[in-house]
Every structure is written in structure tokens, then in C-alpha cells.
């Protein structure tokens, strides 16, 4: 929050684009943008440059946070948006904000996501706090059912933590919503940045 406030004066309602693989910093920047009053824009980093250029042009971000990896159009991205391009971990030397107050209305824009573009040019989907969290109830019910299953089908001395292993990218709504639902219930959320590492990651979890 502190970093974003310094990087974007009067941040309320301003767009912050996230262009990165799944990582810890993705979650930090998503929460930070929302708490600072900005709008999170999740982008598919593996789209072609014409597709990305079109989407970035639509949202007109004040800042683009990215992982620095070249997915095929790094040179074009730097040439076009170098002045507002920053690393995903730019916040690391900032002090925690101690004066956070919620100034966002339930129907104010909070997240912008894009469709896949499989049926024509991708479209921006505008999500307010209210409609973004409409699926939260269903997610919590699902988690509760998993806990019930654990207690009725597994030995009580098997102290497993209810967890969700996400292999979808965080620009996908199905995974992005998990950032907000699972941790706040005390459940573990494991993010994979590459499906090819699935079995390695599962082994590391045990």
C-alpha cells in the first residue's frame, strides 16, 4: 500500500496492471492495490503483443507490475510502457501502511479482467466489490464440505490442513478469487506457476 501510494498519487480508481506468472508477489500486489483504493487489472502475460497492446490501451494503467520474463514481446512492452513498468517486488523496501481505511463503495470498480478472446477480440469484464464476491459463499460452503469429509473419512490424528492447490493462472477468475477466500478462512493456498511442476510441487507440500 505504501509503495503504491507513492508511485501513483491520488491512487483511488487508478488502474494497476499485473503481468506475471503465479507468485507470492502477485497476491501482495493484488491486495495492496485494493487496499490502497486502486483497481486491479489482471493480464494474460502469454498473449501476443497485438492482443496485450489492445488490452493495455483499453485500461490505460497508471502502473504495470511485471515479473521481467520475456514471454515473446518484452522488447515491445518496454518500448511502449517503460516509464510505468515496474518489477513485481517493487514494494519490498517499503514500510507497512498503518493508516488503511476502506474508502471503496460496494459498487465501485475493484477488478478488471479480460476474456480469453476465443470468440473474437477479448473483452474487459468490470467487477465491483459486490459482484466480485458473489461466489465467496459458494467457495466457503465447498470448503466446509471438504472439512466435513476430512472429519468423517480420515483418522482424527491425521492433522492435515485443508488446502487448495491452484494450477490455473491468477489472471483467471477461478483462481484469483481463491486468493481472497482460502487464506481468510485459515486454509492453505498453494500456487503453481507451471503445470509441468505439478508432481514436484505436490511432493514438496508433504
Could you describe each region identified by the protein language model?
Residues 96-114, 120-121, 126, 131, ...:
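Conserved pre-ATP/AMP-binding loop-to-beta segment of ANL
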Residues 16, 33, 64, 109, ...:
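Conserved S/T- and glycine-rich ATP-binding loop of Class I adenylate-forming
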Residues 133-163, 170-206:
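Conserved AMP-binding/adenylation subdomain of ANL enzymes
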Residues 20-21, 38-56, 68-71, 187-205:
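ATP-dependent adenylate-forming carboxylate-activation enzymes
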Residues 30-36, 58, 172, 180-184:
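Short hydrophobic alpha-helices that are characteristic scaffold elements of the AMP-binding
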Residues 58-62, 81, 204-206:
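Active-site charged/polar residues at nucleotide-handling catalytic sites that mediate phosphoryl
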Residues 14, 50, 62, 107, ...:
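Structural detector for helix-capping/boundary residues
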Residues 2-47, 166-167:
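Conserved AMP-binding/adenylate-forming
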Amino acid at each position: 500500500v505504501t509503495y503504491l501510494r507513492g508511485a501513483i498519487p491520488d491512487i483511488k480508481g487508478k488502474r494497476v496492471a499485473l503481468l506475471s506468472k503465479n507468485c507470492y508477489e502477485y497476491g501482495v500486489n493484488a491486495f495492496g492495490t485494493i487496499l490502497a483504493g486502486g483497481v486491479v487489472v489482471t493480464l494474460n502475460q502469454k498473449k501476443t503483443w497485438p492482443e496485450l497492446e489492445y488490452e493495455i490501451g483499453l485500461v490505460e494503467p497508471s502502473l504495470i507490475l511485471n515479473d521481467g520474463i520475456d514471454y515473446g514481446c518484452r522488447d515491445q512492452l518496454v518500448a511502449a510502457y517503460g516509464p510505468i513498468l515496474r518489477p513485481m517486488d517493487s514494494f519490498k523496501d517499503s514500510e507497512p501502511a498503518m493508516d488503511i481505511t476502506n474508502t471503496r463503495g460496494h459498487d465501485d470498480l475493484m477488478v478488471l479482467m479480460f476474456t480469453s478472446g476465443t470468440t473474437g477480440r477479448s473483452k474487459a469484464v468490470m467487477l465491483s466489490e459486490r459482484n466480485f464476491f458473489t461466489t465467496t459463499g459458494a467457495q466457503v460452503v465447498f470448503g466446509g464440505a471438504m472439512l466435513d469429509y476430512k472429519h468423517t473419512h480420515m483418522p482424527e490424528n491425521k492433522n492435515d490442513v485443508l488446502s487448495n492447490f491452484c494450477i490455473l493462472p491468477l489472471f483467471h477468475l477461478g483462481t484469483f478469487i481463491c486468493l481472497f477466500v482460502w487464506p481468510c478462512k485459515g486454509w492453505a493456498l498453494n500456487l503453481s506457476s507451471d503445470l509441468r511442476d505439478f508432481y514436484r510441487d505436490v511432493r514438496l507440500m508433504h
